[in-house]
UniProtKB/Swiss-Prot annotation:
Name of this protein: 33 kDa chaperonin
Source organism per UniProt: Pseudomonas syringae pv. tomato (strain ATCC BAA-871 / DC3000)
GO terms for biological process, alphabetical: protein refolding
Cytoplasm among keywords: yes
Gene: hslO
GO MF annotation terms: protein folding chaperone; unfolded protein binding
Record's keyword annotation contains Chaperone: yes
GO cellular component: cytoplasm
Keyword annotations from UniProtKB, A to Z: Chaperone, Cytoplasm, Disulfide bond, Redox-active center, Zinc
Length: 300
């Protein structure tokens, strides 16, 4: 069964009789757009999809106005995975990899040994926050769950799956004691929902709609499912941002680059592959304080 809304989305749910909330995410279009920009090998595409699902879940969990950045680094076949998701639920992502070192069926520890995962919250107002954890789990789900074990008072667990076509995720998080105040009962309630979630197979997670998933896992528990929140792919690059980067070089260096590159500078967006061209006239106009016009020389 594959009866999802015709959008990418997150969807929150709560347990009426225990202090636990949950979030589900389903990505297809935004995942496909990221993969269309870069034809990644299957194991890399799967890891990137899982990280995209994680970012979407976290944006629904962390209350802030700005940008969430998940960045995984290693010295292995995949030195970089990066996903950005805004509080408006706009996603983009990228991976760097050494194709010669990629093997079919490779997992996180094969591709990113001795890796680390940085979670950065960059609010539009206020201080930037970053936390880092080792990528020491068997997969991204376990590694991200470990991050929250280290940094949060409340229990938080992730289940993430991707297959190159769809990316899905499930998050469970303890809430402050309200329904259940006895510590032992509270722990037992948490273990109950986590144990049941851990029975979900990759095939079920990738193919079943949210109502069916929750019924299979928690048909004996009162669960309330809320409305979906749309997610989309959107790159934040622009000609103006590229011009600002060029301006940071200074007039003399920018003019020299134009000469060295046969009359025009090309700035490429690493996320979406959009290209922005600047010639000598653009550079002169930029440093004269007039900004840069938006000509037809922006290319995909």
């Amino acid at each position: 069964m594959h009866d999802f809304p015709d959008i990418d989305f997150t969807q929150r749910f709560i347990f009426d009789e225990s202090d636990v909330r949950g979030e589900l995410v389903a990505l297809e279009r935004s995942y496909a757009e990221v993969l269309a920009k870069h034809p990644y090998p299957e194991p890399v595409a799967q890891l990137l999809g899982e990280l995209m699902a994680a970012a979407a879940l976290l944006v629904g969990t962390l209350k802030f106005d700005g940008l969430l950045i998940l960045q995984a680094r290693s010295s292995g076949a995949v030195p970089l995975l990066m996903v950005e998701c805004s509080s408006e639920r706009e996603l983009r992502g990228i991976a760097r990899y050494d194709e010669a070192l990629i093997t079919p069926g490779a997992g996180l520890q094969d591709l990113m040994p001795d890796g680390s995962l940085a979670l950065t919250v960059d609010p539009r107002q206020g201080k930037r926050y970053q936390g880092i954890v080792a990528l020491d789990g068997v997969d991204l789900s376990e590694s991200l769950s470990n991050y929250f074990v280290m940094s949060e008072q409340l229990g938080t667990r992730f289940w993430l799956k991707a297959d190159g076509h769809r990316a899905r995720g499930l998050l469970l998080q303890q809430l402050p004691a309200a329904q259940i105040t006895d510590p032992e009962e509270r722990d037992a309630s948490w273990e109950h929902v986590v144990t049941l979630a851990s029975t979900l197979t990759a095939e079920e997670m990738l193919s079943l709609d949210n109502q069916t998933v929750l019924h299979r896992l928690y048909h004996e528990d009162p669960v309330r499912l809320f409305d979906v929140q749309p997610i989309c792919f959107r790159c934040s690059c622009s000609r103006e941002r590229s011009a600002n980067a060029l301006a940071s070089l200074g007039l003399e260096d920018a003019q020299q680059l134009v000469i060295e590159h046969n009359g025009s500078i090309e700035i490429d967006c690493q996320f979406c592959n959009e290209r922005y061209l600047f010639d000598a006239t653009d550079v002169a106009q930029l440093f004269a304080g007039g900004g840069v016009d938006s000509p037809s020389d922006t290319r995909h």
